[in-house]
A protein has these predicted regions:
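N-terminal intrinsically disordered, cationic/polar leader segments
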Residues: 1-31, 41-108
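Short, conserved glycine- and acidic-residue-centered signature motifs
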Residues: 32-36
Length: 108
């Protein structure tokens, strides 16, 4: 099971944490895990290369933590578009595969 936690503060996504593996198929053939991994790495790359945002990304086997610490208004808005796009994509995958993904969204 992949657990994904998204923390939203003041309508901006500040933290995304992913842990676990989908285990929907054998290693190398797990399309759900591959999809989530691809979305996650694409998000990190887009936040740093497109939004030029100040982020902290901790990536290891079966675990990823992304913290968006951007204060600049324009970069913050770009970051928010990217992170909310990620959230919508993950929601879609979770709806189709609830036995492999659990998404928790916390809003303050």
């Amino acid at each position: 099971m992949i657990d994904i936690s998204i923390d939203i503060k003041f309508d901006f996504i500040e933290t995304i944490k992913l842990s676990g593996h989908a285990e929907s198929n054998e290693k190398g053939k797990d399309l759900i895990c591959c999809s989530i991994s691809t979305l996650t790495i694409s998000l990190i790359n887009a936040l740093t290369e497109i939004a030029k945002a100040n982020i902290k990304a901790d990536v290891s086997e079966g675990f990823t933590l992304i913290e968006v610490n951007e204060k600049d208004k324009d970069k913050r808005l770009k970051s928010d578009i990217l992170t909310k796009s990620f959230m919508l994509s993950v929601k879609g995958i979770e709806e189709e595969n609830p036995e492999f993904i659990k998404l928790n969204i916390t809003e303050e």
